[in-house]
């Protein structure tokens, strides 16, 4: 008996797995030319993040949430290898690798994102961010939820030193 997958309960046609992911990065100096990218969307008038990659904390948090379901570490393993061997810094490539780690009978059915940071101003770009996430994950726009908070100065993120993101996603898995 495989303790991880066997259960005395009847096997349902669909099971649902929930993944959670987090990521955060500190801003570079204001004089940095590196763009600030969140969910694949460029935020003008804000410096980029201290990171080997483009620092897209939203895509990174989604990668980590997928990894919590698939048990394949993308950030820290796959992404590091892509960076060190091929110079790839685009977080959408890392997210594609995370999606490929899902089994053929698994699909992402919903994702919820929450972002904390005093800057940049998220509200004007939340719609574009939702669309970018839906496109990257190949799910309907209605299956993407996103919220943002300034943090009210209560943490380093709320004081404007960086940005933090949490992601919860649901993976539907078809059982034969």
UniProtKB/Swiss-Prot annotation:
It is an enzyme of class 4 (lyase). GO terms for biological process: isopentenyl diphosphate biosynthetic process, methylerythritol 4-phosphate pathway; terpenoid biosynthetic process. This is 2-C-methyl-D-erythritol 2,4-cyclodiphosphate synthase. Involved in the biosynthesis of isopentenyl diphosphate (IPP) and dimethylallyl diphosphate (DMAPP), two major building blocks of isoprenoid compounds. Catalyzes the conversion of 4-diphosphocytidyl-2-C-methyl-D-erythritol 2-phosphate (CDP-ME2P) to 2-C-methyl-D-erythritol 2,4-cyclodiphosphate (ME-CPP) with a corresponding release of cytidine 5-monophosphate (CMP). Its EC number is 4.6.1.12. Binds 1 divalent metal cation per subunit. 4-CDP-2-C-methyl-D-erythritol 2-phosphate binds at residues 23-25, 149-152. Keywords: Isoprene biosynthesis, Lyase, Metal-binding. The keyword Zinc-finger does not apply. One of its GO terms (molecular function) is 2-C-methyl-D-erythritol 2,4-cyclodiphosphate synthase activity. Belongs to the IspF family. The record marks 52, 150 as: Transition state stabilizer. Its cofactor is a divalent metal cation. It catalyses: 4-CDP-2-C-methyl-D-erythritol 2-phosphate = 2-C-methyl-D-erythritol 2,4-cyclic diphosphate + CMP. A divalent metal cation binds at residues 23, 25, 60. Pathway: Isoprenoid biosynthesis; isopentenyl diphosphate biosynthesis via DXP pathway; isopentenyl diphosphate from 1-deoxy-D-xylulose 5-phosphate: step 4/6. Homotrimer. It comes from Chlamydia caviae (strain ATCC VR-813 / DSM 19441 / 03DC25 / GPIC) (Chlamydophila caviae). It holds the Pfam family YgbB.
